[in-house]
Structure formats: C-alpha cells, structure tokens
Amino acid sequence: AFQVNTNINALTTSAGATQLGLKNSLEKLSSGLRINKAADDASGMTISDSLRSQASALGQAISNANDGIGIIQVADKAMDEQLKILDTIKVKATQAAQDGQSLESRKAIQSDIIRLIQGLDNIGNTTSYNGQSLLSGQWTNKEFQIGTYSNQSIKVSVGSTTSDKIGQVRINTGAMITAASEATLTFKQINGGGTSPLEGVKISHSVGTGLGVLAEVINKNSDKTGIRAKASVETTSDKEIMSGNLKNLTINDVNIGNIVDIKKGDADGRLVQAINALTSSTGVEASTDSKGRLNLRSVDGRGIVLKADASEDNGDGKSAPMAIDAVNGGQSITDGEGAANYGRLSLVRLDARDIVLTSSDKPDENKFSAIGFGDNNVAMATVNLRDVLGKFDASVKSASGANYNAVIASGNSNLGAGVTTLVGAMLVMDIADSARKTLDKIRSDLGSVQGQMVSTVNNISVTQVNVKAAESRMREVDFAAESAEFNKYNILAQ
C-alpha cells in the first residue's frame, strides 16, 4: 500500500541542511579556498595564516638580501678601481726608485702620484648608495634582516678607503753600531699567535757576518713576522779629502798599502782606485761626492773597520791628520787607530702596529743596544698614503734609515716630498703595498658577506616556495572532491 509522508519538520530540516551544504560548497568552489572563514577550519586557519605571514616575510627578506648584495657590488667595483690606482702608484714609485732619475723627473712622477691619490680619494668620498656614503668609513655595523623573525640578520661593515686611512707603514731604524757583537732576535708573529725566534748572526767585519746577513735572516721570516729589514753600512768623511799620504791603510783586516801624493778631494781618483781594487776582499766600495768627501760603502752588509796612518806635508816636517780621519761623525783613525762602522738596521712593517723585539732566552734583558735598538736609540715613525701628498719630515727621514751616517744626518732635515728621493720612492712602494693589502682585506670581507647573502637568498627562496605550498595545501580547495560534494548537494536539493 502507498503511504504519504507528512513529516514536514523533518523535510524542512533536511532541505535546510542540503541548502547549507550547497551554499558552503559553492562558496569554496567560487573562491578556490577551503577555508573562507574561521568556522570552516579554526585550527587550520591559524596555521595557514602563520604560513602566509612567514612566506610574505621571506619574500621581503629576499629583497633585503638582494639590496645588500647590490650595495656590496657597488662598493666592490669602486674598490676595484682604487686598487688599479694603487697598482699605478706602485709602478710609478718603482720607476722613481732608481738613481737614473733626476730630481726634475722625480718631481714629474710625484705630480702624477698626487693626481692618482686625489682620484682615489674622490672615489672613496663619492661612492654611495641611496644617499649613504659607502667608502668614507661611515658605513659600518649595518644590518640586513634576512629571516622571518626579528634579529635574524646579517651585519656588514665597510672600512674607509680614503688615503688618510690606508697605507699605514711602521718604520724603525736603530742607532749606528760601532762595536762587534752577536745578535739573536725574536719577533712576535704577524697573527699574534706566538713568537718567531731567528737564527743568531755575528755582527762583525768578516765575510758572511754583519747587518746585511741579519737583514737577510729577518726577511726570510717576514711571512711569519710581517717585518722586513734593510741594512745600511756606509761611512762618509766629515770634510773634503786633504792632500797628503796614507800609510798602512787597512780595511777589514785587508792591507791596501801605502797611498802617496793624494790630491785634495782625491782629484785624480788614486785613493778611490786603490780601495776599489780590493773590494772583492774587503767588501767595501769607495767613491767621492761632489764636495770631495770620501764615501765607503759595504757591498754585502758586513761592517767597515778602517785603519791608517795619515800625514800631510806642511812644509815644517810635521804631520797633520787628513780629513779621512774624521769618519763616522768624527771618529779618529790616525796613528793606526781603527774607526768601526757596523751600520744601521732599519725595520719596516706594512701596518700601524709597533715593531716589538723580544728575547725568548732572556726576556728581562731586552736592551738590544748591540744592534742599535737600545733604549732611546731608535728612530720611529708611522706614515700613510695621505703623507705622500706632502713632505716626509725629519722623523720619517731618520726612521726610514736615510740618515745612515752622521754626515748625511747633518744635511737637509726633511726627506722630501713623496718619490723625489730614492729612500722616499721606496717608502712610497711600501705604502702602496700596505694600502693594497688593506683594500684587499676589506674586499675579501665583503666578498664573504656577499657569498653569505647569496646562500641565504637561495635557501630562503626554496623555503618560501615550500611554505607557500604548505599553506596552499591547507587553505585551498580540492576542486575534484568539492565538485563531487557540490553535485551531491545539488541532487539532494532537487
């Protein structure tokens, strides 16, 4: 038998549920989202909102890192140009560091170097990003947020690359050594990790000894100590060579012999020729300057010990000392006495740190007077690239070893401007090297930071994609499943 259902309440409830399901399904299909309101999935909405925020923050972090990379690239290219300038400065300083150059040609080279330094400073002062100067020393301790949460950042600093902040060179020169000794030195290592004891060297006038050998030992270890050395063993007489005779002239225990009828200022060169005839044995080379003064130079860095009897015919049968007996700043060599000059030791360090000599055997006896580095006997100075623009003063002249004997020291108190002297040109070479090392250090640090930023961008780009995918799976609708659900409710609603 047929039965007619008249449960209107049940039918109304069923129809309402069907319409609600149809409405929700249609909303999901039209928006493409599974979660359109908190009621759809409260916990899922919380998680997906968090993922969405994370993905958005990661997108901005990628932009931040790319901005940082751009800034670093601007600074790096600017410093690359500065390095090219420094290379040119060193080449020109090397060109000036030979005595084939006249004072005028050196002045021309100095003018070129001044222009180059001004160009370097112009780059340092004008390189900027978004109105911020990058190479003037003001752009330090900057941060770039490269993560989702606060303080996930990379710090960047760019040191100053202007001439007043780079090219520091520390120079020390000891007093002239006048007594034989033996030196065993220990230097602090360049990285501060310990000390580097050097082999002992005898300071005397025999072959294979002297400050020249000590300088070679120091230079062999410069990669560990950061210190280079130069020995200057040279003697100049105080006055013009006077006419007369030299008897029993001996240099470094090698008998030169008797030299008679020496002309004033050694006009005919007989004194110089006699000394140079035995240079291979004595290690000493002689010459006269424009004032007729005798100059003796050690060719291998050993000491110079000079002995002679000097006489001049005064017409009264008496003998008088010649000017040659006033060498080494006035030390007499008449009556067979010996005048000894073992030279001066100059040390160079291509940064502003002090040069520290120590002794691992006797740390309480670090006087070093035997090599001219005793208390209050050391000339010290620090110069930088900016100093090349002006004149090197008296302190720089002494510290660079230009005052290698008392006669030279009594002359012009200043070293001169930049490369206008041989010693100055060599000092500018060291300054250019030091400046290059400073710029290379800054560039390498920036390169490391740039590499870190690139790796970070690569990492968070992948992370962002995965976070977006996770958020999409949670928030977005499955069209196939939801279409089937919609069709079900649509059929029920008919």
Curated annotation (Swiss-Prot):
It is found in: Secreted; Bacterial flagellum. GO terms for cellular component: bacterial-type flagellum; extracellular region. It comes from the Bacteria. GO terms for molecular function: structural molecule activity. Gene3D superfamilies: 3.30.70.2120, f41 fragment of flagellin, N-terminal domain, Flagellar export chaperone, C-terminal domain. InterPro entries: Flagellin, Flagellin_C, Flagellin_C_sub2, Flagellin_hook_IN_motif, Flagellin_N. Keywords: Bacterial flagellum, Secreted, Virulence. Belongs to the bacterial flagellin family. Flagellin is the subunit protein which polymerizes to form the filaments of bacterial flagella. Important for motility and virulence. Heteromer of FlaA and FlaB. FlaB is located proximal to the hook while the remainder of the filament is composed of the predominant FlaA. This is Flagellin A. The gene is flaA.
